[in-house]
Every structure is written in C-alpha cells, then in structure tokens.
Amino acid sequence: LVQGGRSNGARVACRTACATGARAVLALAFPLHPPGHPEKSRAGELSLARTDVLVINGSRDPFGIPDQAPRIRVVVLDGETHALSRRPETAGAAAGAWLAGLPGLIHP
C-alpha cells in the first residue's frame, strides 16, 4: 500500500501511515507551516510516517518547503504554487519515478 494526499490530506497520510501499514507516502503540497508563520512547523508529521515519503511542493508555496531527511525525499517544482497546477505532468513524472524506485513494490 502506498497512500498519499494533497495539502492537509498529505498530513493525514503521514500521520496514519504506520496504522495502515503503508509501504510509502506521497505528500503533495505538504503544508509545512501556516503562511507567514514558519515557527509553527509541522515537519515532525513527516517522520510520523516511519516509512519512505516523497514530498512534492512548489517553489512558490506560501506554506513552505520541508527539508530532506532520512527516508524523506523532497522535490521542488520551479514556479509552482501550493496548487501544483501549472504543470501537473511534472509532479506525476516525479511521483512515478520515485514509485518505480521503491523496493518491494509490484510494478505493472
């Protein structure tokens, strides 16, 4: 099982990955902090997944961009906002490449 979500759904996916037995989490537009309040970081939620996590955020996301960490890969799409809507195929390609590289998954 690979679970994921966008924005607050990405937070839920990270917080519930352990309970669901997810092999990995895809976190699109993870809201690192409320806009203008970097002191209210939610970075700890990413590590709650306790599995591989891919975060795809836009370079212009007002919710911030998390740092890479062990088991947490961060892809930043240039010019994208929190919506990730300018070039969705770029986010799809990044997610597909990451999924293809995860050991233990069955690929069609």
How does the language model describe each region?
Residues T20, A43-R50:
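Short, conserved loop/helix-junction motifs that constitute active-site signature segments
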Residues G21-G36:
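A conserved short beta-strand
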Residues L48-R50, V55-N57, D61:
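Short beta-strand/loop motif that positions the catalytic acidic residue
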Residues S59-D61, D78-T81:
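Acidic beta-to-alpha connecting loop that harbors the catalytic carboxylate
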Residues E80-G92:
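Catalytic histidine-centered segment of alpha/beta-hydrolase-like enzymes
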